[in-house]
Amino acid sequence: MMCAVTVRQIKPDSYEDFRKAWEPDPWLPKLRNALVLRNEDNPDQVLTIGFFDAGPEQLDTVRDDPAVLAGEDKRLRRIAEFEERVVLNGIFELVEDVKDPAER
């Protein structure tokens, strides 16, 4: 599983608009689900994580698709209106899913 992780500082009081702009449309191939988290101490700092049912090579193939590139370009332009800066952006491979031992 691969994860797209981004932390953004968004403009004050823009969360609802940011959230609408952020939503992938169309939904990305191999994207299983996504999480949107807000910093408790700074609600204008938003962490997004997209979980892809793909290995590194499969995700590269998806990301290189011209239709996906065009859709992501549109989405990022929508987001930019509400974004002050990107704090962190990267693709991470899930290497462990650690669970409570009592739930194993």
What do these predicted regions represent?
Residues 2-8, 47-49:
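Active-site-flanking beta-strand signature of metal-NTP-handling nucleotidyl enzymes
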Residues 7-19:
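Short, surface-exposed ligand-recognition loops at beta-strand->loop->(often short) alpha-helix junctions
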Residues 1, 29, 43-44:
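Coil-to-beta-strand transition motifs
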Residues 37-43:
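A short beta-turn/loop motif at secondary-structure boundaries
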Residues 10-12, 53-54, 93-96:
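Non-catalytic surface loops within mature trypsin-like serine protease
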Residues 88-104:
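Short, low-order "capping/linker" segments at domain edges
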Residues 19, 31-33, 45-47:
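Short, surface-exposed coil-to-beta transition loops
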Residues 23-35, 52-88:
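An amphipathic, aromatic/His-enriched active-site/gating alpha helix that lines ligand/cofactor pockets
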